[in-house]
Design a protein with these regions (language model features):
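Helix-to-loop junction immediately C-terminal to a conserved catalytic motif
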Residues: 48
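Short coil-to-beta microelement around the adenine-binding A-loop and adjacent beta1/P-loop entry
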Residues: 14-15, 70
Length: 130
């Protein structure tokens, strides 16, 4: 089950989501329909951790998304309709996403990422948007 509990997202002064409450039962397939600017893309990008809500909670199978992003990403399939999927990710988030698609655990991702960042002298850029 996926639950959005009072989820809001504000970009600068623009409110993209305003207290969204939504429950999607396990096994259901849904579509989001609405006019431009209604918050459809923001809702999906929040669910797959491309962006983070300003407030509220997203719960997937009883786990709060912000405290367990990698484990939850393993349960959700997402294909972007535009090539901007990676434009707002930090280096750390990008490699977590790529590694999780290969079935790596969070510990494996952290260990491997630490090794690669040190190898290429990139540690100082881990949390910068790429």
């Amino acid at each position: 089950m996926i639950e959005f509990r009072n989820v809001s997202k504000v970009y600068d002064q623009t409110v993209a989501l305003d207290g969204l409450n939504l429950t999607i039962e396990s096994g259901k397939i849904i579509g989001l329909i609405g006019h431009n600017g209604a918050g459809k893309s923001t809702t999906i990008k929040s669910l797959v951790s491309v962006i983070h809500p300003t407030s509220g909670e997203i719960i997937v199978d009883g786990q709060e998304l912000s405290s367990n992003r990698l484990a939850i990403k393993e349960k959700i399939g997402y294909v972007a309709d535009s090539p901007d999927l990676f434009l707002r990710l930090t280096a750390n988030e990008f490699w977590e996403l790529v590694a999780s698609s290969y079935g790596m655990t969070l510990d494996e991702v952290e260990s491997r990422l630490a090794y690669l960042l040190e190898l290429f002298d990139f540690e100082g850029h881990r949390y910068e948007v790429i």
